[in-house]
Amino acid sequence: KRFRLEDQLVRFYPEQLRQQEDYIAGFKVDMQTLSDHPVPQEDFVGIELLGKAYADKSAAGETLLALCKTAPHDHDTAIGHYRGLSVTLSYDSFNAQFQLLLRGEMTHIVNLGADARGNLLRIENALNNIPVRMQKAQEQVDSLHQQIEAAKLEITQPFPQELELTTKSARLA
């Protein structure tokens, strides 16, 4: 048990901390990008699909659905930009559905449905969920710090049956 804890202190915990801190940094960059490209109150900011800007939600949603019908299933296809993030269309063969990958510093996945306007709402909801994802990553960092402290304390504890082990080992020898 002691060696496992030492191994976790040296390898696992630092790697996990670095990963979560990278997530937090990426989320902060993406949140800054989104704040640089705000959405007007109860309105649609517009989306660029295949080089054409769409300011109307219905037209943008219909174009997005049309792209799903013609997109290849075997590789991702870059289709435009939304609020400073690149937009890539991908097919998830496991769930048999299309996904939008919104890429900034991090990748934000949106599962697409059959409703044109609903897909645009899903995109916005995914982007509004970034602070929640960042908070979860921060909670994970805090948890890892607690686990590191507990592991350090556990390593300093002597083996409780050390005397019994020594006595029985001596008898066997």
Identify the residue ranges that each predicted region occupies.
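C-terminal accessory region of SF2 helicases/translocases
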Residues: 1-50
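Charged, long alpha-helical assembly modules
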Residues: 34-79
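Mid-to-C-terminal oligomerization/interaction "stalk" domains of large proteins
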Residues: 1-6, 66-173
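Sequence-level detector for tyrosine residue identity
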Residues: 12-13, 23, 54, 82, ...
